[in-house]
A protein has these predicted regions:
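N-terminal "arm"/small-domain region of PLP-dependent enzymes with the aminotransferase-like
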Residues: 1-65
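Alpha-helical scaffold segments in soluble metabolic enzymes
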Residues: 11, 72-73, 96
Length: 126
């Protein structure tokens, strides 16, 4: 696979360059609701690229376009069969991993210094 291909970035830039009206989350509305100091520090484009899912950008929960292509590229780069992008940082991934890895009644060894999201992954399913 061509690791120089950037399907998700290209889709985001196509959306941003189309001069969209920001009526969705996040609430900063593409930088209009951001303190100017942040815009000056991060650059004017970064907040415009902070988008939720729209039909033009694909659907994270059922990717068929740019997100799917980007996940396939990531899997290829990592040498994995599959790769899934997630929200909420590693917390969501850790919780999902623990929930998926252990069946009911199974024991899991967790180090004391494990991130609290690992413990939440044990608590959530009961």
């Amino acid at each position: 696979m061509n690791q120089d291909h950037t399907p998700l970035f290209d889709a985001i830039m196509g959306y941003v360059n189309g001069n969209p009206a920001y009526f969705r989350i996040p609430g900063h509305r593409g930088e209009n609701g951001v303190n100017r100091k942040w815009v000056e520090y991060a650059g004017p484009g970064i907040f415009r690229m902070d988008l939720t899912e729209t039909p033009l950008l694909d659907d994270l929960h059922n990717p068929e376009g740019a997100i799917r292509e980007a996940q396939e590229l990531a899997a290829d780069l990592f040498g994995a069969d599959h790769s899934w992008f997630l929200v909420n940082g590693t917390t969501c991934g850790n919780e999902a991993m623990v929930i998926a890895a252990a069946g009911e009644g199974e024991r899991i060894i967790v180090p004391r210094n494990a991130h609290k999201s690992v413990l939440m992954g044990l608590i959530i399913p009961g």
